[in-house]
Structures are given as C-alpha cells and as structure tokens.
Amino acid sequence: MTATKGDTRTRLLETALGLFTVHGVEGTSLQMIADALGVTKAAVYYHFRTKDEITEAVAEPALRELSAILDNAATIRRHGAQVEYVLDGLVDLVVRNRVLVAVFCSDPGIARAVERSLHGEENVMTRLPAMLVGPDADDSAIVAAHVALAGVALAGGSPALMAMDDETLGRHLGDVGRRILGRPRKRD
C-alpha cells in the first residue's frame, strides 16, 4: 500500500517540526528533512519549493484556529465572556500544540514565517491582545494582556513543563492568565 500525497505532506510537516525543535528553522535544511523522511530532496520539492513554505505550512493550522477563536469571540456580546472564550481557546490551542509553541517562542525563523503567512490579513497577533482588553483599555490593561499572552505561550511551550499532563497544564495556564488579566477564577 502506498502513502497518499496528503499522508506524505503530513509526515513531511511533522518531520520538519521535529527537526526545527532540535536544530531550529535556520539549522534545518531541505536535505535533512528528506533524509529524516527517507525520501529524495526532489520528493520534498514536490510538496514545497522552499523551507519558508514548509515553515509557514507548519504554523498555518494553529494560526487559522487562533483566527477562528477570535472570529467566534467577536460574535459574543459581553466583553467578559469574550475574554473567557479567547483565553480558554488560546490555552487549549497552546496545550495541544506544545512543540510548535516551543519552537515559535524560541526560534526567530518560525516567527518570521508566521509574519509572512499573516501578510495581507488582519494580524491575529494584534487582534488577540485587543480582544482581551477591549476598546477603552488603559496602558496597564494593555501590558497585562501582553504579559498574559506571552506567559501562556512561553509556559505552555516550556520544556520544563512537557511532562505535565494536558489537563493540569491547561487548568494552571488558564488560572494564571485570569489572574494576570484581573479576571475571576473559573469555577469548576
């Protein structure tokens, strides 16, 4: 039985992410990806012309999901409920994508790819803190939103916390995010 084009592409992206974790985006070559997959470099080129395209494709599903979280939150009338929806969605996304988040937080190569993939769209990274603070936020609230976002991402992708189970990590990330944002603790 042969692998389908989609299966190969998925394996390629998973392999690339694993190599990015070890070597960084800049330290990973197309040849390294091909070797790790057991295919030729030409087979990698069949799916992606450049490493930048691979890097963007690795980040794209999570960015698309984050954008959907923000779009859905925008339909919620109460600002407090929007904040809860965004924070819960972000925490869930971070916990499910720990390895990607770790690379994103530590490797400028993936950060550049994310910026390229957001080109021409309303920037998710601008919408995210704005959704947490609302339109009339003061400087303190804006700083708190950025600290909460950075903290959730950095802690969620921290190698020191990789052994923690998803449920426990998610609960703690949500609790800390709420405290930073001055939100009430979520009831169990």
Range-by-range predicted roles:
Residues 101-102, 106, 114-126, 131-188:
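Hydrophobic/aromatic-rich alpha-helical bundle segments in the mid-to-C-terminal region
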Residues 3-7, 49, 53, 57, ...:
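Residues at secondary-structure transition points
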Residues 57, 68-102:
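Hydrophobic alpha-helical connector segments
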Residues 11, 15, 19-53, 57:
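Helix-turn-helix
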Residues 15, 19-22, 65-73, 151-155:
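Solvent-exposed, amphipathic alpha-helical segments
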Residues 1-7, 184-188:
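Actinobacteria-biased recognition of intrinsically disordered, low-complexity terminal regions
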Residues 73, 77, 108, 159-160:
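Secondary-structure edge/capping motif, primarily at the C-terminal ends of alpha-helices
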